[in-house]
Curated annotation (Swiss-Prot):
Residues 5-81 form a coiled coil. Non-essential, abundant cell division factor that is required for proper Z-ring formation. It is recruited early to the divisome by direct interaction with FtsZ, stimulating Z-ring assembly and thereby promoting cell division earlier in the cell cycle. Its recruitment to the Z-ring requires functional FtsA or ZipA. This is Cell division protein ZapB. InterPro entries: Cell_div_ZapB, SNARE. The lineage of its organism: Bacteria, Pseudomonadati, Pseudomonadota, Gammaproteobacteria, Enterobacterales. The gene is zapB. It comes from Enterobacter sp. (strain 638).
Length: 81
């Protein structure tokens, strides 16, 4: 009977260790999910920022082209004079 009690206590200890390990792993999983969500939000923000910069860049290029056209027109008028 003492032998089976020892076996039972060892089994109980191993089960408790398994439960503790599972609990820790679940906590780790939740932490990693939160980090993953935060990173996904950062990626989304970065993509939005990039798109905004691309639009701004395109507008600036169009403005530059407009100014270059005006400058060429002015230079053409000066040559006529």
């Amino acid at each position: 009977m003492t032998m089976s009690l020892e076996v039972f206590e060892k089994l109980e200890s191993k089960v408790q260790q398994a439960i503790d390990t599972i609990t820790l792993l679940q906590m780790e999983i939740e932490e990693l999910k939160e980090k993953n969500n935060a990173l996904a939000q950062e990626v989304h923000s970065a993509q939005n920022g990039r798109e905004e910069l691309e639009r701004e860049n395109q507008q600036l290029r169009e403005q530059q082209n407009g100014w270059q056209d005006r400058l060429q027109a002015l230079l053409g008028r000066m040559e006529e004079v």
